[in-house]
């Protein structure tokens, strides 16, 4: 008979009925040295087999601690929205820069300009999966995302120094390569802290960053392009890259101190809050990881065999294709009765 989890231990934890298929780490413990537990073992029994002591806390006290935990966590994770805004600003400012002479100054024909737009996604595709495989193996994902943001901010700034097609293509490829670390990494960090029911709302708020960026990127671009032309002898489109890139670097430095890491090692939380954070996710999953002895390539193989992955790929491809007009929207608007200033 399965062991029961006492009220002083894990309240309401469910008996496991299947083996865990994703690699989730808690409290930095290593389960690779122990054999996988039987599929019908209780959560407490699995924890005991691996030498893990589940935290104990009074139910009434837990409610108060959990409320404080989520309040702090929501405040710190809200910076993800700002990072997502800058992520989209830095990849889409090429369309705004085209208004003030980028294409003419760099002597790009229409095909070369379109190549500069598209090459970003080549780097993005190449790096997304390896980046998330890597971030899942490190203990300080906040520094990884902040470091990636700092790098893409520097690369975006260098776009203002491009002198021709070759340099712009190289910069745009590197920009996509580094930017690829953000979105899947952000979703991974959120999944380490929030339960499945809570994730729905947080993921929706995260994607608001995309919408906000689309709403205000043209206004930001218009402000810079209208007032910075000729300042210090440089074209306005160069200032657009320099200003937005500098803003990205500033936010990256701030995010290194604000973003959370993992429940067991994040600064700014009490020990009690960290214990509750770990306990919440263990209870939500309903079981401990029995596949921790598998490497990242095993997880990749499992994902490639999952038909739901391909359904999501098709859906997201249709979504991105539908939004691709953003890269040419400014030019389309100029084909109407609107002027560049409008």
Locations of the language-model features?
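Short hydrophobic/alpha-helical segments at membrane-entry points of transmembrane helices
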Residues: 144-145, 164-172, 184, 235-236, ...
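Central mid-sequence intracellular linker of multi-pass
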Residues: 2, 196-210, 219, 225, ...
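Extracytoplasmic
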Residues: 75-110, 126-127, 131, 217-221, ...
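Hydrophobic core of transmembrane alpha-helices in multi-pass small-molecule transporters
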Residues: 155-156, 167-181, 189
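Short hydrophobic/small-residue motifs within alpha-helical transmembrane segments
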Residues: 84, 121-125, 211-213
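Cytosolic juxtamembrane N-terminal segment immediately preceding the first transmembrane helix
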Residues: 2-94, 104, 301
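Conserved MFS/SLC helix-loop-helix module at the cytosolic interface between two early adjacent transmembrane helices
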Residues: 125-168
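Extracytoplasmic gate region of multi-pass secondary transporters
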Residues: 95-96, 295-342
């Amino acid at each position: 008979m399965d062991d029961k989890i006492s009220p002083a231990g894990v309240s309401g934890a469910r008996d496991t009925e299947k083996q865990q298929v994703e690699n989730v780490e808690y409290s930095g413990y290593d389960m690779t040295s122990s054999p996988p537990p039987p599929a019908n073992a209780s959560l407490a029994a699995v924890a005991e087999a691996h030498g893990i002591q589940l935290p104990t806390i009074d139910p009434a006290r837990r409610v108060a601690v959990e409320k404080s935990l989520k309040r702090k966590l929501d405040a710190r994770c809200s910076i993800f929205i700002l990072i997502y805004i800058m992520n989209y600003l830095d990849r889409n400012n090429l369309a705004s820069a085209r208004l003030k002479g980028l294409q003419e100054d760099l002597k790009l024909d229409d095909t070369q300009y379109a190549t500069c737009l598209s090459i970003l996604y080549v780097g993005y595709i190449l790096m997304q999966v390896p980046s998330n495989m890597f971030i899942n193996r490190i203990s300080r994902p906040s520094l990884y995302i902040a470091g990636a943001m700092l790098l893409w901010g520097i690369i975006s700034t260098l776009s203002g120094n491009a002198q021709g097609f070759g340099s712009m293509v190289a910069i745009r490829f590197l920009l996509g390569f580094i930017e690829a670390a953000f979105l899947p990494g952000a979703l991974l960090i959120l999944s380490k802290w929030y339960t499945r029911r809570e994730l729905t709302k947080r993921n929706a708020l995260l994607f608001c960053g995309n919408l906000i960026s689309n709403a205000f990127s043209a206004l930001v671009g218009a402000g810079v392009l209208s007032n910075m032309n000729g300042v210090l002898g440089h074209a306005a489109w160069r200032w657009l890259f320099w200003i937005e890139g500098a803003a990205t670097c500033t936010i990256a430095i701030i995010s290194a101190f604000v973003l959370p890491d993992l429940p067991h090692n994040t600064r700014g939380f009490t020990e009690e809050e960290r214990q509750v954070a770990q306990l919440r996710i263990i209870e939500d999953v309903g079981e401990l990881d029995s596949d921790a002895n598998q490497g990242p390539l095993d997880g990749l193989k499992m994902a490639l065999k999952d038909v739901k992955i391909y359904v999501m790929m098709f859906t997201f491809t249709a979504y991105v294709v539908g939004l691709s007009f953003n890269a040419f929207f400014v030019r389309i608007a100029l084909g109407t009765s609107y002027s560049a200033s409008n």
